């Protein structure tokens, strides 16, 4: 009974997916399908409280529900709820089937919940594939648009290659240690010394997970996929998907710490290069979705700093940064979603689509401005708190060159974030683009982005509740 209660959020999401599938087979109705999805996700989010009271509990040898799993589950469900709500506004004017989007979204969310609870390589692979496969369909959902079809196929092919690296790395680890559980791997790695096959296995696993996190040099797919995919699907890929992978990587490194100096140094170099490459490549972008893609690369470079340090504050720092990143990313992509719709061609992602937005959509302009400031790490926004923690753990560990990389990357990023903000307030152009819904503020999507903007500001001014909650969850 305890195990069932601990897994109740995952069970509810899976049950909702089944109900939605049966509903689609019975009767196609966009409003009904979206409502069932949102109700099921809200029930799953409420069930996280029940799961927390049961934690920590081992659910079979494959999964464990502890504070970190509940924390990741909350973030994934919040991001999925936002994507479902924003997707409703986005798909309202779409031609053809719309209901399957919610089914794919629920299946991907179930994969994310399974992934953050995994403590075994088999569960890790199962959760990762359950998360990735629905994304193939979501990214190519508006298949009449050439860019969406290209994004879906590109992500599918490269993701399959990354999964092959991941599987081969798992095979090498199992052949040398006889263990697939994280704890057993940790003990074997601690006593193995500098075994080359073990390090090769860990390295190949890092390649597979690094692809999912867009770590340099496995990042080249990111801007193309973000640009071509439908805005709600890109939102999920940039938020919930990366949260799940980052948290399972954190759990893996905590259970199976990297002892060899060269592999530890490799992680540090990857963090440094990812920070700088992501920010430098974003400087020349004129497409907001591509810009946010490169920005995402840079932010996961910052997050790698916490994983490299891997001291007492590493988990807390990574979790805190994930909260600020998810809120900000959902808000930024939410504005893109509300200004886009399949009935007016490709998404409103070019910067010239946002020229003079202040004069016709002042509230959306305010939201996007807040999100850009938070991504840049400006004080009085949630993004500043996350970046402060990253710098603090780097200083505490005397990783001065990584701290320098964070500071330099943030300085470079400030330029292109300000460039977006300036565009919003330029004189209005003669040609206006058709937006998704005219009375957006009366709809749930507008409420979502306004609520996210308010949270980003409030948590930036008064971060104590967020810090206490993260510390409580990670410690539990």
Swiss-Prot record:
Enzyme Commission identifier(s): 7.1.1.-
UniProt-recorded Gene Ontology molecular function terms: NADH dehydrogenase (ubiquinone) activity; NADH:ubiquinone reductase (non-electrogenic) activity; quinone binding
Top EC class for this record: translocase
Its membrane topology: Multi-pass membrane protein
Disulfide-bonded cysteines: none
Record's keyword annotation contains Oxidoreductase: no
Localization in the cell: Cell inner membrane
Membrane spanning residue stretches: 4-24, 32-52, 67-87, 100-117, 121-141, 155-175, 198-218, 230-250, 263-283, 291-311, 319-339, 366-386, 406-426, 447-467
Keywords, sorted A to Z: Cell inner membrane, Cell membrane, Membrane, NAD, Quinone, Translocase, Transmembrane, Transmembrane helix, Transport, Ubiquinone
GO terms under cellular component: plasma membrane
Family of this protein: Belongs to the complex I subunit 2 family.
Name of this chain's protein: NADH-quinone oxidoreductase subunit N
Organism: Chromohalobacter salexigens (strain ATCC BAA-138 / DSM 3043 / CIP 106854 / NCIMB 13768 / 1H11)
